Regions:
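Phosphate-binding site of ATP-dependent enzymes
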Residues: 169-259, 280-287
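Short acidic/His/Gly/Ser-rich catalytic and metal-binding motifs that mark active-site loops
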Residues: 14-18, 155-158, 234-237, 299-300
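Short glycine-enriched, charge-decorated loop/helix-capping segments at active-site entrances
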Residues: 20-26, 161-166, 304-306
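Active-site nucleotide/adenylate-binding loops and adjacent lid/helix of ATP-dependent enzymes
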Residues: 2-9, 64-67, 107-196
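A short beta-strand motif that forms the metal-chelation/ATP-contact edge
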Residues: 3-5, 72, 148, 199-205, ...
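ATP-binding N-terminal substructure of ATP-dependent carboxylate-amine bond-forming enzymes
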Residues: 1-98, 105, 109-111, 134-139, ...
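ATP-dependent carboxylate activation and anion-phosphoryl transfer catalytic cores
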Residues: 119, 124, 248-346
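Hydrophobic beta-strand scaffold residues
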Residues: 47, 98-99, 127, 147, ...
Length: 346
């Protein structure tokens, strides 16, 4: 009898992102669901699509009654609530259900950008200097310009625009106020590393071919992956951003980038697969910008593109993700083993 796999995902619904024009990042999960379903069917699995909607108690009951041998976790959190992304692996762990991808602890740690950066620093991994600031604490600013101002607990580049990069006090005040008002709480301000930009996907314990992001933008537009660069095809950022995979880099650069990606993967306690985003600073030093557990794996995304470059093909990529989860069956309960000492909630 064929093994039954449940693809668990968040059913797109109205959310706070609708009013900010950022809803496309939420609905994109459906593209991943369709592609993963097709790949799993090709691999001979019996597939059940399992969309989840709030409230948490009812969603937990759905997971507990799946009757599947494996949960393929594509859940990104309920709409407008990225902090709920850890919900599915947490319930699966409680019920001893095998699931793909990262544990809930890693998802929660990576989403809180300051806690993640502290963890990376504890593990000896370079990341841009940073502060948490609100409109009331701007007087404490101590970093060097240019800086980038980000929401503290968002993913998918929510809240990132061309104006997010600031070079003076007036612009800093404006962006901190915008982020604090639009996304709640304090803003993450970090020194902007504006050199070459790379990302690498870790699959199991293997680092896939590195990608480099290139920019062909008008003068004065900061080189960074804004929300528009990822989700708005008609925007200058989308049209002016490109990806080279495999990146044209030396063997030494490949070794450095891949080693940093794997170290970051382990530092955050990831399992299965994750993408690590990195940039060079003005001195040519590689800095980790972000660790993305369970990144978007729709065809054409960074992780899928790197799997293609590795010769896996999309179906082979999904097969490797399943194999990484199956490996955990022999190591139950799932391990959460980030490096470094305990950290505060900052």
């Amino acid at each position: 009898m064929r093994q039954r796999v449940a693809i668990v995902y968040n059913q797109p619904q109205p959310s706070r992102y609708d009013s900010s024009g950022e809803s496309l990042a939420v609905s994109s999960v459906l593209e991943a669901v369709a592609a993963v379903e097709h790949a799993l069917l090709e691999l001979g699995f019996d597939v059940a699509l399992t969309p989840l909607v709030p409230p948490l108690r009812e969603a937990a009951a759905v997971i507990k009654n799946l009757g599947a041998g494996l949960v393929f976790n594509l859940f990104e959190g309920f709409c407008g609530q990225p902090e709920t992304e850890a919900f599915v692996p947490e319930v699966c762990t409680q019920r001893h259900l095998l699931y793909t991808g990262c544990p809930g602890e890693a998802l929660s740690l990576a989403l809180h950008k300051v806690r993640a950066k502290v963890r990376l620093q504890q593990c000896g991994i370079a990341t841009p200097d940073f502060q948490l600031l609100s409109p009331d604490t701007l007087r404490l600013f101590r970093l060097s310009y240019p800086c980038i101002v980000k929401p503290l607990g968002e993913d998918a580049s929510h809240g990132i625009t061309a104006e997010s990069v600031v070079s003076n006090q007036c612009a800093l005040e404006k962006q901190v106020a915008r982020v604090s008002l639009g996304y709640g709480g304090t803003a993450l301000v970090e020194e902007f590393a504006g050199g070459r930009e790379f990302n690498a996907t870790v699959l199991g314990e293997r680092v896939l071919p590195v990608s480099e992001i290139g920019y062909a933008l008008p003068p004065g537009m900061p080189r960074l992956l804004t929300y528009d660069a990822k989700w708005q095809p008609q925007s200058l950022y989308y049209q002016g951003s490109s990806v080279v995979c495999p990146a044209v880099i030396s063997d030494e650069e490949q070794k450095k980038i891949a080693g940093t990606a794997l170290a970051s993967f382990r530092a955050i306690g990831c399992r299965g697969y994750a993408r690590v985003d990195m940039r060079l600073d003005e001195k040519g030093k590689l800095k980790v910008i972000e660790v993305n557990p369970n990144p978007d794996i729709s065809p054409g995304t960074g992780a899928a593109r790197q799997a293609e470059a590795a010769g896996l093909g999309y179906t082979g990529f999904i097969e490797k993700i399943v194999a990484a989860a199956e490996k955990e069956r022999r190591q139950w309960p799932p391990r959460f083993e980030p490096c470094g000492a305990p950290i505060s909630a900052a």
